[in-house]
Every structure is written in C-alpha cells, then in structure tokens.
Amino acid sequence: EMQRSLVGSEMCIRDRSCACIQVSKVGFRGKGSGMVANRAYKFRIYPNDEQKILFAKTFGCVRMVYNHWLDRKIRQYEENKTNVTYTICAKEMAAMKKTEEYGFLKEVDSIALQQSLRHLDTAFQNFFKQPKTGFPRFKSKKRNKNSYSTVCINGNITISNGYLKLPKIGQVRLKQHRIIPDEYRLKSVTVSQTPSGKYYASILFEYENQVQEKEMRRFLGLDFSMHELYRDSNGKEPAYPRYYRNAEKKLAREQRKLSKMQKGSNNRNKQRIKVAKLHEKVSNQRKDFLHKQSRQIANAYDCVCIEDLDMKAMSRSLNFGKSVSDNGWGMFTTFLKYKLEKQGKKLVKVDRFFASSQTCSVCGYKNAKTKNLALREWDCPQCGTHHDRDVNAAVNIRNEGMRLVNA
C-alpha cells in the first residue's frame, strides 16, 4: 500500500558515468533521422582550500536535505497515509532557509539542494516501479560517496580556459583531457569526492546527432562466465585479469593495519587514504579493460545479444559474490550498450529464464542434466553434437536475439 501511495511526479537526470566519456541517454526519432543524445565527460578538478570547504558544506547540506525529507515522507505516510510531493518539499525547504536555525543552507548552491529533493523523489519512483531496488535509505557521511548535482541555468555553469565555473564555488581548475564540440549544450554537473580525497566533475551535455540505424547483419551472442568475463558465440573469450583477486592480499594487509590504528590520528588518516587509493586502482584497471573490450565488440558487430541477468541476486550468492564484483558484468553491459547505440546498433537482452545452457544449439534438444553447473562439456543425445557449455549457451543466446530482432 505504501508503494502505491508515495509516488511522486518529478524526474531528474542523474549522472551514472563510470568513465571519462559516456552516452547516458539516447533517443531515436526515427530510422535515419536525428538523434538526441546525452554525453557525460568526467574530468578531475583541483579546488583550492576555500573551495574545498564550500564543497564539504554543499555535500553536507545536500545529505541533510535528503535525509530530512526522507524522514518527513515516512512520518507523514505513517500518520495519515498520504505522500509529500516534490513541490511541497521544495516550498518547505524555501521556508526553512529563512529561519535562523537553517540559515546555513543559503551558503550553498540552491539548485543542488533542489536536485537532492528530486533524487529522493526519483529513488521512491524507482522503488515503486521495481521494489527489488530497495526502499530509499538515509545517507551516511561515512557510508555514502560525497557528491552533489547542479543544473545549468542561464549560463551559471561554464567551461573556459581550463576552469569550470560553478554556482557559489566560482572558478575551479579543471584537467580537460578532451575537446568539447561547440554544438554540445551543457545540461548539468555532478561534483564528487573519492575516499582518497580526489575531486571530479561529471559534466552532462546534450547534442543533436545524425545516426543511421544499421541493418542488423553481424550478430554476436555473449554468455557471461565466472572465469573469463564471457564466452562469445564464436568460441572466443577475453584474457581477463582478475584485478580484485590479484590485489586482495595486499588490500587485506593494509586494511588490517588501518583497523589497528587509533581513530582520529594523522597516521590512521594516511593509512585510510592508502587503502582508498588501492581500491581506486583496482576500479580504474577494471574500467579500462571493460572499455577496451566493449569498444572492440561494438566496432565489429551490429547487434550483440546477452542474457538479462539479475546482477544483485548473483552478487548476494555465496558462490558468485566476488566473481560477479570482480568481473563487472553490469558495468560492461552499460559500456557496451551506449557504444552500440552511438553507432545506431543494438544490444538485445534475452529473457533470464531462457534455457540457453540446456538447449542443443544444433537440433534444439533440451538436456536436463546440464542444470548441473559442474558439467562443462556434453554430447547431445539426439544429434550427437559435442558442446562446450558456455559456447553452446552463447550460440543459443545469439539465435534467440536474432529471432527477437526479426520478429
């Protein structure tokens, strides 16, 4: 009942960029016609000491606003079964800023505070559409990443001569490693701080692009693998380095050192940054590898077919947890999707209950014995074809994807 009652109406653009450059939203207007696309560039920024203080204040205020109205929504529903809409929350926040107790909210970007309310509203909408995403949680200073989003209105955000101008912050030095085309329109910026203390700005642009939808001729099926990221329908697999597994012992050793140090000491803070940098290195190595693999596939094929896997459920599995996290299937899928769409190509997801591993890709016979995951190779009892479990599954996924595209 609560899920049906707490539905809001406002939506927002949230930066989900994992890389330096990403198409985060694509809208086709028709075959061979113009395409409206959003592209996000992620640049490192170097704030001065005064700007770092302002960023810290903004992170804190955004978190406080989110938590305050999350509590407000929950209490109102418990009292009279009604919802507090985004509009009501925004009006209450405007009044709150005029009080002496909450006057500090005026010191930070007002749009960032509004975006925090929109993010809360979106979190509820996502929960109502898909309860498995989980009920919105209160944000913690320690648990959550420091970040806030702001929107470009009347030129309040600009990039010029190696500097990014942000509301209330001013000119922040920017490491711009890519040229931004003149026709790109700046839409929003998400500022974030990593656990190691680095600052980044993910800048979202909108642009018009003429993309000719490709004729689907070259199909590829991918079966995600615990050992080598995936096996494709041609029998190939990438030589995937297990970055987290390789760094696990070193991470554990440094984490033990951190746990033994006195809280609040300078040495503990130095060790905390050291551990954070190790995690960042693993993450960056994984992203680099996944970007290169997804680029090779997107350039070589017109349509890529994969299984629609439940990544969260697999991560919670006792047997699959570390493998799923280390492989980064979800991230790889995201990278592959936007790279294909940018070229007018497609990523097709096959139903997760499709029996790709049990079905013979030659004659269609279903072999129930293959439900045993330990069975890596098998011979079809009907046609006698010898199968590698993963390659056979990838071929079936490709064939099912072709059927869906041509249906």
Model segments located where?
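Single conserved hydrophobic/aromatic residue that forms the stacking wall/gate
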Residues: 1-15
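Nucleic-acid substrate recognition interfaces
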Residues: 14-407
